[in-house]
Amino acid sequence: MPDWLLTLLITVVKAVAVILALLTTFAYMTLVERKLLGRFQIRVGPNRVGPMGLLQPAADAIKSIFKEDLQVTLADKLVYTLAPIIAIGMALTAFGGIPAGPEGSLFGENPWVYNLDAGVLALLALTSMGVYGIFLGGWASGSKYPMLGGLRSSAQMISYELGMGLSILGLLMLVGSTRFTDIVLWQGANGWMILFQSLGFALFLISSFAETNRTPFDLVEAEQELVAGYLTEYSAIKWALFQMAEYVNMITASALMSTLFFGGWRGPGFLNGIIPGIADIPILWLVVKIGFFLFVFIWVRATLPRLRYDQLMRFGWKLLLPLALFNTMLVAGYIAFFSSWGWWPLALLSLLGLTALLALSDTVRQLWNAPMTRRETELPPVPTRSAGGD
């Protein structure tokens, strides 16, 4: 067999394995989320299908596949059908660039589907392209509420993609590479990036909630305002594909935070002194870290209320973006003037930046609780007709 064909075959097998793992995780993430939300709200959660409700994801999948697929008369049928495929396709493709271990650690093969020189930039580009599926789905539905949800998704992505990119710019300046494997190896030699970029991590975490359209930034499908946003006119398997894309994006965002700030596949080194070799099991530690951040996503959903749309935009442009620029300037100043002092000045500067963010809590609260704009508060009253007629 030619080498190129063998390489292609191995890549296809790894891609299929990643897709199956993501879809299985998505299925049981829905169950875990409903169970945890039930605990948070002092109720039981799904417990009827199978032992302890463990077969609920299978029941949901069968229901989605065999439900009637309704379609609005005015919908653009081609785009309406392609939109969920684009959303899930971008989500699945993005995760393939996350390394699950060092080179050659997967039965002699590399534990990733692709490892580009510009891996971080490529993954951010792929995750941001998922918004095309949401916008096109809203536009092609032929209804006003999905269209509003699609427009919100575009504005939200533009606002928070800038903050997300700038929040990791300092990290990339320190490492000097955009390859995920180089970033993990750098952390193995110098310590987890969270020690030196705590402010950058806080900003990236907030941006991740907005990028994945999760509470408190789930404005694109706000039930109280837009019925279900871009999902209003979708049903059956097309609706399930959009839900699948959302959860896969959550998994990808969790893997990104684990890789960029928490050492990726590496476990805490001090554990080797307790149980020899326990910190050197690559895939195990990546899965544990991803699971932790998925719990954070669910925890925040159960805790925080949804923002208003004007609060969402104000928070992104007036607070998140300036702080991300400030963090980048801190790292640039460290590299220019203090790099010969070691890593402790950078850790101190990052901690001071995070303290400044906490010190701005009053400003954050003002942005959060700001009144609506003048135009919104001074809308003319809606004329009414008397019930008795003329």
From Swiss-Prot:
Catalysed transformations (reactions): a quinone + NADH + 5 H(+)(in) = a quinol + NAD(+) + 4 H(+)(out)
Pfam families: NADHdh
Subcellular location: Cell membrane
Keywords: Cell membrane, Membrane, NAD, Quinone, Translocase, Transmembrane, Transmembrane helix, Ubiquinone
EC number: 7.1.1.-
GO biological process entries: aerobic respiration
Similarity-based family: Belongs to the complex I subunit 1 family.
Quaternary structure and interacting proteins, as annotated: NDH-1 is composed of 15 different subunits. Subunits NuoA, H, J, K, L, M, N constitute the membrane sector of the complex.
HAMAP family recorded: NDH1_NuoH
Protein name in the entry: NADH-quinone oxidoreductase subunit H
Species annotation: Deinococcus deserti (strain DSM 17065 / CIP 109153 / LMG 22923 / VCD115)
Taxon lineage: Bacteria, Thermotogati, Deinococcota, Deinococci, Deinococcales
